[in-house]
């Protein structure tokens, strides 16, 4: 079946979220006078990432709100160094203000999207809020490629890997799932989720060399691999 549309994840697929989060938390802890209370800057970064990977899935499972998991991560990070805050929302927002000055798209994102223009429909399906991801895509210059075709779990009500959100993304493009590819950086949430929803699934593993096929998912090391679709 010919692929007529591609849906994209955003964080660590189109946008280098990991590098941005690293720079943001280091700048934030420095500004708060807390960085030297961690064993090392890298320890602070690793702990912040660990907390996100532990608490964010609880949001996806419906145990926490999107804002709630952010506030909890703030409280847990501070508790690790024996600190606290009366307003975890404001503490996280100060982190966001610093983090969001450093957003950058991966070098292969813009060339691919430009190459697809007029040939393949594109859209976004993301486990986040629409305002957040639209702002991010606008900052890095990629939003014009997507227009209104940005679907996020906070508004839709169901996150990846549930098939409903992938199928809603296909509807957004006006295409059946068998004519749509999905690419994201997480094997389970993106690769297996898209596969199980009936889309052609691509797992973006930037550490991979070349292209491979695994459990019905195509593994690619760069977005450039999609230019041949």
Regions found by a protein language model. Give the residues of each.
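Residue-level marker of alpha-helix boundaries and capping positions
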Residues: 65, 103, 124, 181-182
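Short glycine/serine/threonine-biased micro-segments
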Residues: 60, 121, 182
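Catalytic-core regions built around general acid/base machinery
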Residues: 108-119
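Asp-based, Mg2+/Mn2+-dependent phosphohydrolase catalytic module
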Residues: 1-6, 18-19, 114, 125-229
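Glycine-centered short loops/turns at secondary-structure junctions
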Residues: 119-120, 198
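N-terminal helical cap/lid subdomain that shapes the substrate entry/recognition surface
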Residues: 2-107
């Amino acid at each position: 079946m010919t692929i007529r549309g591609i849906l994209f994840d955003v964080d660590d697929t189109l946008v280098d979220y990991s590098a941005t989060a690293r720079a943001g938390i280091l700048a934030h802890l420095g500004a708060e006078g807390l960085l030297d209370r961690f064993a090392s800057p890298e320890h602070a970064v690793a702990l912040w990432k660990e907390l996100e990977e532990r608490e964010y899935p609880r949001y996806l499972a419906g145990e926490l709100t999107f804002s709630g998991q952010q506030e909890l991560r703030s409280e847990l990070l501070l508790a690790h160094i024996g600190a606290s805050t009366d307003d975890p929302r404001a503490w996280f927002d100060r982190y966001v203000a610093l983090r969001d000055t450093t957003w950058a798209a991966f070098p292969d994102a813009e060339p691919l999207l430009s190459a697809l223009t007029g040939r393949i429909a594109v859209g976004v399906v993301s486990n986040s809020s629409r305002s957040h991801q639209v702002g991010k895509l606008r900052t890095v210059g990629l939003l014009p490629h997507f227009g209104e075709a940005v679907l996020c779990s906070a508004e839709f009500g169901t996150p990846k890997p549930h098939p409903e959100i992938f199928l809603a993304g296909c509807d957004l493009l006006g295409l059946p799932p068998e004519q749509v590819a999905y690419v994201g950086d997480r094997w389970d949430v993106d690769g297996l989720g898209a596969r199980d929803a009936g889309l052609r699934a691509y797992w973006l593993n930037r550490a991979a060399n070349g292209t491979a096929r695994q459990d019905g998912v195509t593994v690619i090391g760069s977005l450039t691999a999609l230019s041949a679709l």
